Every structure is written in C-alpha cells, then in structure tokens.
Amino acid sequence: MARLRLLIGLIFCLAISLDSVLSAPVISQISKDVVASVGDSVEFNCTVEEVGQLSVSWAKRPSESDTNSVVLSMRNILSLPDQRYNVTVTEGPKTGSAIYTFRIQNIEVSDMGPYECQVLVSATEKVTKKLSLQIKTPPVIAENTPKSTLVTEGQNLELTCHANGFPKPTISWAREHNAVMPAGGHLLAEPTLRIRSVHRMDRGGYYCIAQNGEGQPDKRLIRVEVEFRPQIAVQRPKIAQMVSHSAELECSVQGYPAPTVVWHKNGVPLQSSRHHEVANTASSSGTTTSVLRIDSVGEEDFGDYYCNATNKLGHADARLHLFQTVIPVPSLS
C-alpha cells in the first residue's frame, strides 16, 4: 500500500511539472529588424503562445549595451502618452496564442534603437525577444574629428575622420583646391589619412568627406600645419651701386612658425633708421620677403650683409655683398 501511495505521488508531481512546462509562455515569433527613414510608419509584431493571463509589454532600450528598458505598452494599453504610438492585441494562429502589435507613425531619429517584447512570468522572471529599428540618416562628421593639427617636418602623420549616420558612412579625403595628395592622385578612399615623413609641401587644407547615399555628403576642412626650420633664398647675392645712390638688398624666408628676420653688418643688427629701412612682407604662401633699403649709399656701407632668420626649430643665414661701381668716363682721345 505504501508503495502504491508513493507511485501515485510521483505520477501526480510529474503531471504538475509537465503541465507547468506545457503552459509556460513562449514568444514564437517577432518581427525582423527594421530599417526605415524619418517620417515613415513602422510596425512590430510579437506572437506569444500560452499567454494566459500574463502581461505582455513592448519596451525600448536606450542602446544595445544598456539593459534598462522603458515600457511603452502593457497588453493593449499605452504606457507613454505619445500620439504616434498605437498598440493592439489580436488572436494568434494557435489556441491560447496572441499577437501584440506596436506601431509608430512619423518616426524620428530618437526612435532608433532596440525594442523588446516582454512576457512577465513573475516578479523576477520574464521571457523576452528583441528587434532593432535602424533609421536612415544623412552623414554627419563627428565632433571628435579634429579641425586642425600640427606636425614637425619628418614625422609621420595620421588623421582619422569619424562620421555618424545610417547606413554607416564611407570616408574619403581630398586636398583643398583639388591639389594632388601626398601619395598621388586626388582622392583617398580611407577613413584614416596617413602621411609618412611629412614634408613642408604637405601643409594645407584636407577635406574629410562622409557619404552614405542619404542626403548630401558632409565634409570638414582640416588644416595641417607643418613646422620646419627657416630656409632663405636670395636672387641677387651681389649688388653693385654707386656712392650717393640708394640700394636694396632682398631675401625670401620660409619657415614655420614664421621666422624672425634680422639684418646684420659686421655682426651688428640693423634696424630701421634715417639711413636704413627694413621692411618685411608676408605672403599667403607663407613666404616672408625682407628688404633692406639703404638711402644714399656711402663708402662705409659697402661690404657683406647677412639676412638671418630664426624660429624655435633653428636658424639660417644668407650673405649678400654690396660693392661699389663707377660710371666709366669716356676717353677723350
């Protein structure tokens, strides 16, 4: 008799367990991930079997990595007062099943993200499945993309352009004024611009261009400044002049940061005075033209002059020689 009671008890427990398994809610189907444009209407469907009296809700998570969700609806009642939202519950294809449909009209960028269909089994247990809503947005270059950069000549340079948008934007690079890229060509289809052993000729503006087929491409001009030692060019290293006439000595200086230019004679720096005038003119190309003008040249003004240019990377000198010339007197014979 005791064995019979034990057997009956085991059968009863097994029946309860089996009934519990058979009646557990199951999300048998959920809509696939959705891709839409701003202003469209979207619809999510979630089919739940063995739902019984359990509560089924739609919820939105801020991101894939954030597990906290905001409940949007519970059964057929909206939890948030948004006129764009609508939720309905209809009978499912199987007995005891139901389809929970959540609709959003006139979607906005803020609607993008993961959505969950949730079946609340108990206070600590729920059955969930999720889908993702991706919204097509035109490319926007991110703020963490630099607007300028500084590099010393001879170093390597890497510039990475970041852009947001969906589909994921493609990045390309082009030089300002359609100039040739350091590696050749006029366009580089890479997110990162790499220049090995930067040269001063690489300085200038580079456009980061982002495009994904949605709206207009976005672009940003990034200024590349290259630091380099001063370099001096002299077109006329020897200047002939007569006494009592004016003379001009000229040198062209390049360098970054812009060098300080000083003229010397006999180791003494020359400054603008009644006898000497120094004029420095900077051009848009980064070249400084320095002119030393001497009014009414005297005997003591002849000799060597030095154009000296200095910046934080070094200095350069160029020698110019002012010598006396005379007008030949024609012979009377």
Swiss-Prot record:
UniProt main location, coarse: membrane
Signal peptide location: 1-23
Membrane topology classification: Lipid-anchor; GPI-anchor
Positions of the Ig-like C2-type domain: 139-223, 230-323
Disulphide bonds in the chain: 46-117, 161-208, 251-307
InterPro entries: Cell_Adh-Cytoskel_Orgn, Ig-like_dom, Ig-like_dom_sf, Ig-like_fold, Ig_I-set, Ig_sub, Ig_sub2
Keywords, ordered alphabetically: Cell membrane, Disulfide bond, Glycoprotein, GPI-anchor, Immunoglobulin domain, Lipoprotein, Membrane, Repeat, Signal
One Gene Ontology cellular component annotation held by this UniProt entry: extracellular space
GO BP term, example: positive regulation of epidermal growth factor receptor signaling pathway
Compartmental location: Cell membrane
Molecular functions (GO terms): receptor ligand activity
Name of the protein: Protein amalgam
Gene that this polypeptide is encoded by: Ama
